[in-house]
Swiss-Prot record:
Function: May be involved in plant defense.
Protein name: Thionin-like protein 1
Keyword annotations of the record: Disulfide bond, Plant defense, Secreted, Signal
Listed transmembrane segments: none
Alphabetized InterPro entries for the sequence: THNL (IPR038975)
Keyword Transport found: no
Organism: Arabidopsis thaliana
Annotated signal peptide: 1-23
Main localization (coarse): secreted
Subcellular localization(s) per the UniProt record: Secreted
Protein family according to the UniProt entry: Belongs to the plant thionin (TC 1.C.44) family.
Gene Ontology biological process terms in this record: defense response
Domain of life: Eukaryota
GO CC annotations, alphabetized: extracellular region
Amino acid sequence: MEDKRVAMLVVMMLVMGNMLIEAEAVMSFKLCYGGCLVACALIAPPIKKLFCPFLCIKDCKRRPMLSFEANLNEIDQTGSYCELGCATDRCVSSSSIDDKGYYVNFSGIMWRKFHYAWIHAQKSAPTRTKIAIDFSL
């Protein structure tokens, strides 16, 4: 009984942590700049505190716009779907019974096709980034 409670607690913490990261990623420029300025004022050495506003502007402006921050009417996701579908189709088309005797050559071909599909899947997948504040000059 105790193991189930611990497992439920761990799952709940993972879900809440994921929600926290999602909420943190949607931060606007004002929130990013304010938090960065406070953190810089508390952490940076006295001489570098003069550069805090400039460092924070640089770090908060550099933050990429995430896919869910963009206007959803302007996003055309059919191109991404077609790239991923085309890449997957190229991988699947090589896996037939006729290739059974050519395992060495076939594995090399499949590796190249898998690599191609992986690259296109990474291009079409939305990315999650965390911005790190760099206090070094």
